[in-house]
Regions:
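Divalent metal-coordination and catalytic microenvironments
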Residues: 33, 62, 126
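Active-site-proximal beta-strand elements of phosphoester/diester hydrolases
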Residues: 1-3, 33-35, 80
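Short, well-ordered, mixed-charge alpha-helical segments that flank or form enzyme active sites
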Residues: 4-9, 40-44, 67-68, 147
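Conserved active-site and cofactor/substrate-binding residues in soluble primary-metabolism enzymes
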Residues: 7-15, 46, 118-121, 133
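Short beta-strand/loop segments at the ligand-binding rim of alpha/beta enzyme cores
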Residues: 27-36, 54-58
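A short C-terminal boundary segment appended to hydrolase-like catalytic domains
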Residues: 100-151
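Conserved beta-sheet core of the metallophosphoesterase superfamily
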Residues: 41-114
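Binuclear metal-dependent hydrolase catalytic cores centered on His/Asp/Glu-rich metal-binding motifs
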Residues: 1-29
Length: 151
């Protein structure tokens, strides 16, 4: 969990640094995917750069909106700020749009309900080097629903 807007969480950068010091890709594990649940782009990008050369993929899933920045970083870690969601994009991050609008209008917490429209499947495919566990290529995808894949 990221630390920005989630203050009750442990210091994720301290924990990540300790992990990197203790574990090595291709020695302790074949591949490493860092699923970094965070609110803001800069924090996710910093985590991607911290793990560059130590992880196969750093992906940030939390805002649910796919970004167009999939790439392999200079030391071989694939990165994307947000792979998107599996859900209805004719909604508010997968939840019923009107219910979400009412939450903002009334300034009170209301229960969220999933949207019932056609779902999209969003994600990434990473081509990895089995010798070192690092990425050779990353491609994002979107299937179904109202968003069109531009790749």
């Amino acid at each position: 969990m990221g630390n920005v807007f989630m203050k009750k969480c442990d210091d994720v950068f301290k924990i990540a640094t300790e992990f990197i010091a203790q574990k090595k890709i291709s020695k302790d594990y074949d591949f490493l995917i860092v699923d970094f649940h965070g609110e803001i782009t800069s924090e996710k990008m910093a985590m991607g750069n911290l793990f560059d050369g130590y992880a196969t993929l750093v992906v940030g899933p939390h805002p649910h909106v796919p970004t167009n920045d999939a790439r392999v970083l200079k030391n071989g870690t694939s990165y994307i700020t947000d792979a998107g969601m599996c859900g209805d994009y004719e909604s508010v991050i997968g939840m019923n749009a009107q219910n979400s609008i009412n939450r903002f209008l009334k300034k009170e917490a209301v229960k969220h309900f999933p949207a019932n429209g056609e779902a999209s499947l969003s994600g990434v495919v990473v081509d990895c080097d089995v010798r070192n566990g690092l990425a050779k290529n990353i491609e994002s995808f979107i299937f179904g629903g109202s968003l069109n894949n531009v790749n």
